[in-house]
Design a protein with these regions (language model features):
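Extended beta-strand/beta-hairpin segments
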Residues: 1-72, 83-174
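Alpha-helical metal-binding/catalytic segments enriched in His/Glu/Asp
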Residues: 75-79
Length: 174
């Protein structure tokens, strides 16, 4: 496992590369999600494969975490990793770090019961628990800097354009 010095060296090299040629850091990420039995999906992204499902109370079999768990995990893990990256870059030691992601919801929107209720979260917040020998000012600077450059935090806080493209393949009649 790389230590903070190794992480800083790698990140400094990446920063230099994208500073010299922005195109090095630009691209499009593609994740494929396939429907499986019932309310289960299989996610495929490069070498990674994992399942997503729904609980029994929504008609699933509770065989995998639901999309909300992965969404909250995406934000929380992005924050934890970002704090680690910026700690290495700024030289701020972290002895322990946990991020809790809280999301308020009303399932009436998602289930189409009430059109005035949003199908997504009504509010989100995160709580950072951090232990460090650094001063409170240094830790606050670290957290503020990492939050400013957190990609998932940014995706959630601003409206990212989202479009849908559909390809319909009709089954041959027998």
């Amino acid at each position: 496992m790389p230590d903070d010095n190794e992480i800083k060296t790698v990140l400094d090299r990446v920063v230099k590369a994208v500073t010299l040629r922005a195109s090095v850091g630009q691209g499009t990420a593609v994740t494929k999600v396939h429907k499986r039995d019932g309310l289960t999906a299989e996610v495929e992204d490069g070498p990674w494969r994992f399942s997503v499902g729904m609980s029994e109370k929504y008609g699933g079999d509770n065989s995998a975490p639901n999309p909300g768990v992965y969404g909250r995990a995406a934000l929380g893990s992005c924050l934890v990793i970002g704090y680690g990256m910026w700690a290495a870059r700024l030289g701020v030691p972290i002895d322990a770090l946990t991020v809790e992601v809280h999301a308020d919801y009303d399932v009436r929107g998602e289930l189409g019961v009430e059109d005035k209720v949003t199908p997504g979260y009504t509010a989100m917040r995160y709580v950072v628990h951090i232990e460090s020998t650094a001063s409170a000012a240094e830790v606050t600077k670290l957290l503020d800097t990492a939050d400013k450059y957190s990609s998932w935090r940014d995706d959630i806080m601003r409206a990212v354009p989202l479009t849908r493209e559909v390809h319909i393949n009709t089954a041959a009649k027998r």
